Amino acid sequence: MRKLNYYIYTLCFLSLFIGCGEKQLNKPVAINSNPPGLVSNVKVVNENGKAVITYSLPSDEDLSYIKADYETSPGISTEVLASRHTNTLTVDGFGDTLSHIVKLFSVNSSGVESSAVEVTVNPKTPGYILAARSLKIEPTFGGFTLNCKNPTGDDLAVIPMVDTSGNGNWVQTIGMDNVYSNDTVIAAAIHNQPSVRRKFAFTVRDKWQHYSDTLIVGLTPVFEQKLDKSTWATITLPNDAQILNNGGWCYEYYMWDGNEHPGWPQTYFTVESATTPQTATIDLGSAHTFSRFKINPYLEVGNFYYVRGNPKDFEIWGSNSPDLSDPEPDILSDPTWTKLGTFHVVKPSGSPSQTETSADQASAYNGWEFDFPTGLSAYRYIRIRQLSNWQGTYFICISELTLWGD
């Protein structure tokens, strides 16, 4: 019993000792209530929507950081911190070109601030205003295209709206989503709009919730419809890809049977041994002017889309009088075929093979959609030419192909 009590007392003593030690360690080594010195030799370089400030640091040994306090807009305060290991900080988020006062504070390791050093910045025109000034809207099939320059590379949203009732009530209809981008040139197409003249409104917003003036335009989208697949037919040219037979034939017509998410083997699939770009040819029954198209990839084993023969880089060609007599036609030199475009599938996450995020899966499930270049002639026959699949080879796998146009 005495030994047990001895052990208990010893453990209690050690616990108290350790607890006291922890309290001591959590206490500041020293409290410095003296404010540090001021920054000096302050210089400003004004840029679009922001300013870069350089300065000389005070000589205080316990200087922790420099703080800048300022308002991006009246009543909207923000602060920026810069380590003691740099003499530069950037104040950004300005929504105008007015003069703004920035207060610079030196802060020591105890959190004590110096008095403020005031400097005036005069930011240049913010990126969202530059983008709005360059915004151009043009009617296209089933909607409109929008293009603008974003020379500052800011994170911007172009917000489209439409007055469906003609009474100034601006709304976003189905398919009319915001366009988000930080590219130096922002380009997008909005579809699913009726071919009637209406007023559309556009504004540009940045990540600080600054909004540009609204651009209002009246336009009539070009008539567009989903092409009727019941007239489509297989036409096999001599050097077209050979379809696969593995538990059943993977016929070409599965590309237009209306099933975007088929099981095996109800998908178009070609032999995997191909060593050159492969082609598939379709007779649409009549000539059409194409506006856009969608490819639904096949969901492979393991629940993956961005694998194996699903298209990654490919071309689409058009013709009205293909030469069927040539035993080995070369689409690149055959004058009866015209290249309509080269297309690249982007994996939203950019993750490696067999790693697919929910965004990757949603993009593939909904179908990879592309716009054709404007000004194309009408064509009856099309060829899909696979340049590279997700395996880095040439065989083709497509669950469904859908075309829009007139």
Predicted regions and their residues:
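Recognizes extended acidic, P/S/T-rich segments that occur
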Residues: 57, 63-97, 162-195, 332-358
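Preference for solvent-exposed, low-hydrophobicity sequence contexts
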Residues: 164-190, 202-244
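Disordered, acidic Ser/Thr/Pro-rich linker "stalks" and the adjacent N-terminal cap
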Residues: 217-285, 298, 360
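Aromatic, loop-rich ligand-recognition surfaces of beta-strand-rich domains
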Residues: 260-331, 364-406
